[in-house]
UniProtKB/Swiss-Prot annotation:
Catalytic-site annotation from UniProt: D14, H42
Protein name listed in UniProt: Adenylosuccinate synthetase
GO biological process, one term: 'de novo' AMP biosynthetic process
Family annotation (CDD domains): AdSS
Catalytic activity entry: IMP + L-aspartate + GTP = N(6)-(1,2-dicarboxyethyl)-AMP + GDP + phosphate + 2 H(+)
The UniProt record lists the keyword Metal-binding: yes
Gene: purA
Protein residues bound to IMP: D14, E15, G16, K17, N39, A40, G41, H42, T131, R145, Q226, T241, R305
Length: 432
């Protein structure tokens, strides 16, 4: 049996997973997305050329590599085909021939988007920060057992029956709860009839293929989306996404046994960011935070939304390491910290009752009341951009990485010093 690696975001998303998955994909026989939708982008830079992927696994740029979308992913057919067309236009070869979609993937259709946006508009100041792309309602349908799934595209007559029943449910909410326009079945069917001929050939028993590949000695790479602190169960609920973002979700979301998950690589930014609403104990509102945002280009690759920036939160990461079983960390954007004179690391929190904790509490209400406890370290003036050898890093940068290891309790396996695939320091290869 080959060794397999799960890559997950260990913070609130946007940690730089795409680059690392693309880099690791050189040694993989297949790359699998196992949860999430097209609500977050994975940015890859190869030879200075930028590619943003939302649904398609980040291994697709390796032109002999098979890529898979597992049943834990909610798929927008229109977004998927748009992404395929972008890759085709960029000269990536045989995308549709190498991309396989599980028949059990729930589809995101126009009524999901309509309800998602209507709900967020109705919340007023209580917005939870949804991207409005229908992700949440699609997951609701999955759990409520009314989802239209990829396999339904193969049976249009039965699909129409399911659609009529689903729209009866959705249109009541749209019209009577949110004062919004109803969605017409004919409009949804027009979308389905347009996308089905292209998507149908990609529908494959992903679970079976992955298990066969592993049995034949091929390495598999499981690619997570969002971040562990946005997990529906363990994140800062309700300011979370609608899926399980943890490493363990790779098993159910891809259709493989947990014994096939050999190494968990947690992607960790050298500082902390968060998009949208929700508690953020180490958030900075000063020039340091603004500088991190500017140097780190902290804007969402899909949404364009500005990211909130703060000091490294080791107490939050400790929770992530615990719930994911992280084997090693990849520290990204170390170069963004260049020139920060004094660096703070959050090592715990003061609680309202006067107590202290060294790990992130569960749920947003508890996190909202936390006051960060900081350790202070000297920064470094030298540039770390593009460094590929650990020994060439400034002493203070190495001390920073070492302290992160000590406080969090997990080793640093990889350090990313720039956006390009090659701008990477390897201390321990996850596939080794």
């Amino acid at each position: 049996m080959a060794k397999n690696v799960v890559v997950i975001g260990a913070q609130w998303g946007d940690e730089g997973k795409g680059k690392i998955v693309d880099w690791l994909a050189e040694e993989a026989g297949g790359v699998v997305r196992f949860q999430g939708g097209h609500n977050a982008g994975h940015t890859l830079v190869v030879g200075g050329k930028k590619t943003i992927l939302r649904l398609i696994p980040s291994g697709i740029l390796h032109e002999s590599l098979d890529c898979f979308i597992g049943s834990g992913v909610v798929v927008s057919p229109e977004a998927l085909l748009g992404e395929i067309d972008e890759l085709n236009a960029a000269g990536v070869k045989n995308v549709e021939g190498r991309l396989k979609i599980a028949p059990t993937c729930p589809l995101i259709l126009p009524y999901h988007i309509a309800l998602d946006q209507a709900r967020e508009a109705s919340r007023g100041k209580g917005k939870i920060g949804t991207t409005g792309r229908g992700i949440g309602p699609a997951y609701e349908d999955k759990v409520a057992r009314r989802a239209i799934r990829a396999a339904d595209l193969l049976h249009p007559e039965k699909l129409r029956e399911k659609l009529d029943a689903v729209l009866a449910y959705y249109n009541v909410q749209l019209q009577h709860l949110h004062n919004a326009e109803p969605v017409k079945a004919e409009d949804v069917m027009a979308v389905i009839e347009k996308v089905a001929p292209r998507i149908a050939p990609m529908i494959t028993d992903v679970s079976r293929v992955l298990n066969e590949k592993n049995k034949n000695g091929e390495k598999l790479l499981f690619e997570g989306a969002q971040g562990a602190l946005l997990d529906i169960d363990y994140g800062t609920y309700p300011f979370v996404t609608s899926s399980n973002c943890l490493a363990g979700a790779a098993s159910a979301g891809a259709g493989v046994g947990p014994q096939m998950l050999d190494y968990v690589l947690g992607i960790v930014k050298a500082y902390t960011t968060r998009v949208g609403s929700g508690p953020f104990p180490t958030e900075l509102f000063d020039e340091v935070g603004a500088g991190l945002a500017e140097r780190g280009h902290e804007f969402g690759s899909v949404t364009g939304r500005a990211r909130r920036c703060g000091w490294f939160d080791a107490a939050a990461l400790k929770r992530s390491i615990q719930i994911n079983g992280i084997s090693g960390m990849c520290i990204t954007k170390l170069d963004v910290m260049d020139g920060v004179e004094t660096i703070n690391i959050c090592v715990g929190y003061e609680l309202p009752d006067g107590g202290k904790t060294d790990i992130l509490p569960c749920g947003s209400d508890a996190v909202e009341t936390c006051k960060p406890i900081y350790e202070t370290m000297e920064g470094w003036k030298e540039s770390t951009f593009g460094i590929k050898n650990y020994e060439e890093l400034p002493d203070n940068a190495k001390a920073y990485l070492k302290r992160i290891e000590e406080v969090c309790g997990a080793p640093v396996a990889i350090v990313s010093t720039g956006p390009d695939r090659e701008e990477t320091i390897v201390l321990h290869h996850p596939f080794a």
